[in-house]
């Protein structure tokens, strides 16, 4: 039965890509079905470049992924059953499901498309209700050599950390990337200058939204430079105004995101730096431009073939609440993470990690009192194909 379903998918995708060729419904060497070919996906989740040119081969890639966890937090759940900064492992003192996702991707030398369906605590705590089942749904066409136009729903390309735990070193998401977009709705134009440099311009409905909230659009630019197969540098810029149309005072936002990934022997690490400004947004003077900044460093040491040790330090400062809104984090929040990962096979990962967050405001609730510190312990199991 499974073989028949897969064969049917090949026929359908071949039909839409054949453009009237009489023999296109017969699977041949020009058609390739791939199931679960990715094993090492760390740092891949937010890269701006995807499949670009596969020659005359029509490829269909099917994938599946399940991420389960148990988490303990020293603070209480106060946000619809989730802890403060809910993304990965957001439920306290219980087993949970981060993600269960199924994806299908099609690409050849002129057309490509991707649809990924999802379910779990990550979309439940962060996606708008009508769209919780959709992680990605977009299609693309090659306009000229090395120039692609894609449109639809995208997961975010901004930030070092992805919303999929398997694509990160840690099993938790930093406060930095929690306040960066998770998803976009719009269009991207991507040009691969050469094997090292890729440029992209994009237009979206807004900052972390599917449905437009005003008449303004978010505009962005990205540049990816692969120094070699071990070192990669990415710069993202985004400008938008989320002010409702009926408000006279506007708040134009400019967000700059720079990160690098490095894989040097047994050591892998990433560095991210962010800087943002927003007009008419200072708390003490609403006519002045406010700013925020953040940074993180994450690393992993492959101590043995199947065992890795990892850590992360993070810093986030948004005293004028450009991104945090009504939540007062004061001048800063910083944290440290330490964990151990065991990979019994290439597409399975077991991790245990400890994290501490320290804020200069008392934002965490512990029983009958407030605290400026949170301790976390997370156990995570990731399996994918």
Where are these regions (language model features)?
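Transmembrane beta-barrel domains of outer membrane proteins
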Residues: 53, 103-105, 140-142, 188-192, ...
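Bacterial Sec-dependent N-terminal signal peptides
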Residues: 1-24
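N-terminal periplasmic/intermembrane-space "pro-region" immediately following the signal or transit peptide
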Residues: 18-77
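Hydrophobic, lipid-facing positions within transmembrane beta-strands of outer-membrane proteins
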Residues: 60, 97-102, 134-139, 183-187, ...
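Surface-exposed extracellular loop regions of Gram-negative outer-membrane beta-barrel proteins
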Residues: 100-121, 190-194, 198-200, 259-277, ...
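Surface-exposed coil loops of outer-membrane beta-barrel proteins
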Residues: 7, 24, 34, 73-94, ...
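Outer-membrane beta-barrel pore domains
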Residues: 33-36, 86-89, 123-127, 234-237, ...
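Outer-membrane beta-barrel channels and translocator barrels
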Residues: 55-57, 107-109, 144-146, 156, ...
